[in-house]
Amino acid sequence: MKKKYDIKTTDVETLKKWYHLMTLGRALDEKAPSYLLQSLGWSYHAPYAGHDGIQLAIGQVFTLGEDFLFPYYRDMLTVLSAGMTPEEIILNGISKATDPGSGGRHMSNHFAKPEWHIENISSATGTH
């Protein structure tokens, strides 16, 4: 009998990378509200919990130099998975001049890195 499906497995190094990204993203997601409570930045925070798997996948299939990414305010793990650093995400959150997306002018959670074609969008996403 011929097999109907051929299931490929994921190598251990890739699984470790995904685990690292997911735990790092969750740590950032959980830390952001403390900046807000201390009035250190993060004008607001919308956690992405429950969207982890799809956000990781979207970031992993993003091809630098070919694709455009238009993340909305809950897409922290998407941009982390696409290659933005935790430092860049925090700089956005606390509105510092060295934020790569806006030089500290965008609201927090409006992730961007224009040279990578990761573009900022409006808060009114029209997705809900």
Label each residue range with its predicted role.
Residues 1-15:
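Charged, compositionally biased N-terminal leader segments and the immediate start
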Residues 5, 9, 25-33:
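Conserved N-terminal diphosphate/IPP-binding helix and adjacent helical/loop segment
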Residues 30-128:
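Cofactor-binding active-site loop characterized by glycine-rich and histidine/acidic residues
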